[in-house]
Amino acid sequence: MSLNLFKTTVNDYLEGLPEQVQSRLYESPATCLAIYRLLSPMAKFFIMSMLFQDHDVSLRDLDKWVKPDAKYQLQYSIKSMKSLNLIIEGESKQPLLIRLNPIFKKSFKNVLTGGEINNSFGDVADDDTNPVSTATLDQYSAEKWETILHYMVGTPNTNTPGGKVLDLLQHSGLMEEAEYGELKITNQGFQFLLQDVNAQMWTLLLQYLKMAESLQMDPVDVLNFIFMLGALQLGKAYKCDQLSNTQRTMLQDMRDYGLIYQNQSDYAKFYPTRLATLLTSDTKAFRSASVALDSVLNKANETTAVEGDSGQDETTERTQDGALIIETNFKLYSYSNSPLQIAILSLFVHLKSRFANMVTGQLTRESVRNALLNGITAEQIIAYLETHAHPRMRRLAEENLSKKLELDPTVKETLQVLPPTVVDQIRLWQLELDRIISYDGYLYTDFESYQEYQTVADYAKDIGVLLWQNEKKKMFFVSTEGNSQVLDFHRRNFDK
């Protein structure tokens, strides 16, 4: 999932809130800043243009500011701002005149001008004599977040997340109950693993919001706290005494997700982790918590930078992300030492060897069928392979496409990163599975006459338990649930 798509998902939730709830949200300057960051560039421009205007603004004026080929973006931005209740009808009540929501306008002005913000951005604990290092915060948040991901993919010998986290995973449809009460990953869960860390966090937090509403928790308090976390400063301690009862309850849950850290000896303060600061960040999305944290730490440790090193760093980041090469013979090489990435691969790849910085395996009919039977689709497997393809595979695909375009500029082929034979075979394995559906039931044969066969088969069809029949061979198949009814019917009418 791209960063834009995750923003759209958050906006969809916010747009669906009642106007009264939206207005209460805008009383918090930190929330106003976070929502502003989630808007499209054009909507941001309109907000800034109207922020210091004391009179109504005409929609015709906004239309004049936009190029003719950007009318769709204009309509989308206006619709989004209206749905969020950021713009309302002008004071003059004349058509086509609008103004900023006065509550949002006041709070957002305070953000930009340093006005009254009422601890909206947290209350810093000045008496923090033993601060927690950023390295400790980074390690803590990565362990907590990736514990959740490891549990989802079934990595052996890993810790189990807290009970509330498991409830959330099940409630959100990312995992479902299997045999013996254990949880297993679902189709949606595998799609969740394909997302970047920002989208993963917001996916769970939006489900947390829905669960919070059913638990009678104030959604405004919940949202304000989440948006506040995204605006706090890494490495600073913040007091808990200004938090509402709802937000105090959230502290334990946010600890389980790795968004905040608290010393066991001092629960009066909390520290936001780097994952929390990414919640409303406009920086690029990362594929995992480890990659996000390692990227920041690597930049902090750099003392010199040359052009050659830059390319090496980029390759290293991709390698940490599990860059892989797949051949036409279905052999796969993944340059990763991450247990999480290896566990995800094991869901649909038959792994053979593991080295210090690489694992090898092969896509087989059985390994892919096992993934398909567990709810993972062929398109999701293909998407994962494309997303994590090695830069050299992408470069080779681009070169091949360029050569085809040179020979025939009208060619309509798209960039094929993966070997076509591999992509086609994965889809064929799914089609093969879709053609075969198994049912438990009973086969009826050896009827004395065609009339006897037809009468019993028609009865089975009428009561909806007939699954298959062959008139030439005078046989049919009924479900387990309907077998007793068909037997009783046969005894009443044909047994002497």
UniProtKB/Swiss-Prot annotation:
<dbReference type="InterPro" id="IPR004598">
    <property type="entry name" value="TFIIH_p52/Tfb2"/>
</dbReference>
<keyword id="KW-0805">Transcription regulation</keyword>
<comment type="similarity">
    <text>Belongs to the TFB2 family.</text>
</comment>
<dbReference type="GO" id="GO:0001671">
    <property type="term" value="F:ATPase activator activity"/>
</dbReference>
<keyword id="KW-0539">Nucleus</keyword>
<comment type="subunit">
    <text>Component of the 7-subunit TFIIH core complex composed of XPB/SSL2, XPD/RAD3, SSL1, TFB1, TFB2, TFB4 and TFB5, which is active in NER. The core complex associates with the 3-subunit CTD-kinase module TFIIK composed of CCL1, KIN28 and TFB3 to form the 10-subunit holoenzyme (holo-TFIIH) active in transcription.</text>
</comment>
<protein>
    <recommendedName>
        <fullName>General transcription and DNA repair factor IIH subunit TFB2</fullName>
    </recommendedName>
</protein>
<dbReference type="Pfam" id="PF03849">
    <property type="entry name" value="Tfb2"/>
</dbReference>
<dbReference type="GO" id="GO:0005675">
    <property type="term" value="C:transcription factor TFIIH holo complex"/>
</dbReference>
<keyword id="KW-0234">DNA repair</keyword>
<comment type="function">
    <text>Component of the general transcription and DNA repair factor IIH (TFIIH) core complex, which is involved in general and transcription-coupled nucleotide excision repair (NER) of damaged DNA and, when complexed to TFIIK, in RNA transcription by RNA polymerase II. In NER, TFIIH acts by opening DNA around the lesion to allow the excision of the damaged oligonucleotide and its replacement by a new DNA fragment. In transcription, TFIIH has an essential role in transcription initiation.</text>
</comment>
<dbReference type="GO" id="GO:0006289">
    <property type="term" value="P:nucleotide-excision repair"/>
</dbReference>
<dbReference type="GO" id="GO:0003690">
    <property type="term" value="F:double-stranded DNA binding"/>
</dbReference>
<dbReference type="Pfam" id="PF18307">
    <property type="entry name" value="Tfb2_C"/>
</dbReference>
<keyword id="KW-0227">DNA damage</keyword>
<dbReference type="InterPro" id="IPR040662">
    <property type="entry name" value="Tfb2_C"/>
</dbReference>
<dbReference type="GO" id="GO:0000439">
    <property type="term" value="C:transcription factor TFIIH core complex"/>
</dbReference>
<keyword id="KW-0804">Transcription</keyword>
